[in-house]
């Protein structure tokens, strides 16, 4: 009797790859290492993913959707910014992949030539909707504010992930961040 394909193998491969990334970054992520960690063989990995970039792209999409879900669960744009920062702080390796590789994996001419399909920008789309719910007008009206917020949130996330802010100063930095986001939303900074 022939073996039946495992319908969850792709998910197992991605889980294994994400764990490898978390432990060792890009150097740890080889097709052979992924296969071993997933409990399968290398040809099985190649049947589901063309190459390492294809696996990274799938992990990246997961991360993008996880961050978007965190922002979506927020009751306000302010809370959405806080949740984004929380995700970056509690998942530094995933956030590292998110900020370092998004353009290269989804939007660069090289990745598009290799068959990558731009996957939208789920975090931006959720935040744009949150801004529209709070401030009214059309979503396109909030482009400059959204850009300004993204710069502040990403900058704060980078400082926390890189451990540039001393642990003793983290609470004060968080208060500054919260106040700055509130001020930007109140004053329409960036519009």
Where do the protein language model's features map onto the residues?
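An amphipathic alpha-helix adjacent to DNA-recognition modules
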Residues: 7-18, 22, 27-28, 39, ...
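Hydrophobic alpha-helical connector segments
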Residues: 58, 69-96, 122, 145-149
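Amphipathic alpha-helical packing segments from all-alpha helical-bundle domains
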Residues: 107-136, 143-148, 171, 175-186
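Append "Primarily bacterial transcriptional regulators
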Residues: 32-36, 45
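Amphipathic alpha-helical segments used for helix-helix packing
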Residues: 90-111, 125, 158-166
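N-terminal intrinsically disordered/low-complexity leader segments
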Residues: 1-7, 19, 191
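Short, charged helix-capping/linker segments at alpha-helix termini
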Residues: 27-28, 137-140
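Amphipathic C-terminal alpha-helical segment
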Residues: 150-168, 183-191
């Amino acid at each position: 009797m022939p073996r039946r394909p495992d319908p969850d193998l792709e998910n197992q491969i991605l889980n294994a790859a994400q764990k490898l990334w978390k432990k060792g970054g890009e150097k740890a992520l080889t097709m052979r290492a992924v296969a071993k960690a997933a409990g399968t063989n290398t040809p099985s990995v190649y049947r589901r993913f063309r190459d390492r970039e294809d696996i990274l792209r799938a992990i990246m999409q997961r991360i993008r959707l996880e961050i978007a879900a965190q922002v979506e669960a927020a009751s306000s744009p302010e809370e959405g910014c806080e949740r984004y920062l929380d995700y970056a702080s509690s998942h530094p390796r995933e956030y590292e992949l998110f900020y370092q590789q998004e353009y290269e994996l989804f939007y660069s001419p090289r990745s598009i030539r290799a068959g990558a399909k731009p996957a939208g920008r789920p975090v931006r789309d959720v935040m744009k909707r949150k801004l529209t719910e709070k401030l009214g007008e059309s979503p396109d009206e909030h482009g400059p504010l959204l850009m300004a917020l993204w710069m502040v949130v990403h900058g704060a996330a980078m400082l926390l992930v890189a451990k540039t802010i001393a642990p003793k100063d983290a609470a004060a930095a968080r208060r500054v961040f919260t106040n700055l986001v509130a001020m930007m939303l109140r004053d329409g900074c960036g519009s």
